[in-house]
């Protein structure tokens, strides 16, 4: 039997909402200390509900909820403010971040560092920062925080440190392996420079080559861990932007 509990004053972000019954919502949230979970907001669609206008994506909230099981009951939600609204390209990028969290994070699995990375990404998008480096930073943080062991600084075959002047094939669920020439890599493995790997490890996406190569590498890795699940937000982004 699920243990019922009351959680108060929990920092959280709304990832997705769905209508439920006639007047309520199922709200998928990402919380600081409890990870991703589903809450039912009873009566949230009624005209005078305290939840109306509060349960918005990309806005920091404080939430109280109660209950056990797969879906808890949302008791209170309070807007914290301070976050610019996402519009245009930034809004599409935000939906992409949310879809990654929904499809890759298990429920009830806390990831406080990932929570901080998400908040940082949303803030940067809201401030009008160029989206590509913001997305790459978050994608990398997501894979690392979920325990996928993204190796960036050691050659997995030789054990030696990655060299900035070398070229590597990236073995999925392994790591970089040095190549004598870029054409030596198997066709299904991404090829990256050592400098790109070192830049990624340092969180530096300022070089154009690093930005381009990290995009390809992270896309391959994310697709692998998605296990064939499509990302609708990515499809829209690909149609509108080169992200």
Swiss-Prot record:
Gene3D superfamilies: Nucleic acid-binding proteins (2.40.50.140), Recombination protein O, C-terminal domain (1.20.1440.120). Keywords: DNA damage, DNA recombination, DNA repair. GO terms for biological process: DNA recombination; double-strand break repair. SUPFAM superfamilies: ArfGap/RecO-like zinc finger, Nucleic acid-binding proteins. InterPro entries: ARFGAP/RecO, DNA_rep/recomb_RecO_N, NA-bd_OB-fold, RecO, RecO_C. One of its GO terms (cellular component) is bacterial nucleoid. The keyword DNA damage applies. The keyword Electron transport does not apply. Pfam families: RecO_C (PF02565), RecO_N (PF11967). Involved in DNA repair and RecF pathway recombination. Belongs to the RecO family. HAMAP family: RecO. This is DNA repair protein RecO. It comes from Azoarcus sp. (strain BH72).
């Amino acid at each position: 039997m699920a243990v019922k509990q009351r959680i108060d004053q929990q920092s959280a972000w709304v990832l997705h909402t769905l209508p439920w019954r006639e007047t309520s919502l199922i709200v998928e949230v990402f919380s600081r200390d409890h990870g991703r979970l589903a809450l039912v907001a009873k009566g949230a669609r009624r005209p005078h509900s305290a939840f109306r206008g509060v349960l918005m994506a990309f806005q920091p909230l404080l939430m109280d909820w109660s209950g056990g099981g797969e879906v808890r009951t949302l008791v209170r939600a309070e807007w914290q403010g301070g976050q610019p609204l996402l519009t245009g390209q930034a809004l599409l990028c935000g939906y992409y971040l949310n879809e990654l969290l929904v499809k890759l994070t298990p429920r009830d699995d806390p990831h406080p560092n990932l929570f901080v990375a998400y908040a940082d990404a949303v803030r940067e998008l809201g401030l009008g920062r160029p989206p590509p480096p913001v997305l790459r930073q978050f994608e990398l943080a997501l894979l690392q925080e979920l325990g996928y062991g993204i190796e960036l600084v050691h050659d997995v075959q030789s054990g030696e440190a990655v060299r900035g002047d070398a070229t590597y094939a990236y073995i999925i669920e392994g790591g970089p392996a040095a190549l004598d020439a870029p054409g030596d890599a198997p066709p299904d493995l991404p090829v990256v420079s050592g400098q790109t790997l070192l830049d990624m490890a340092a969180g530096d996406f300022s070089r154009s080559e690093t930005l381009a190569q990290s995009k390809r590498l992270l896309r391959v890795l994310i697709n692998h861990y998605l296990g064939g699940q499509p990302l609708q937000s990515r499809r829209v982004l690909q149609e509108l932007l080169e992200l």
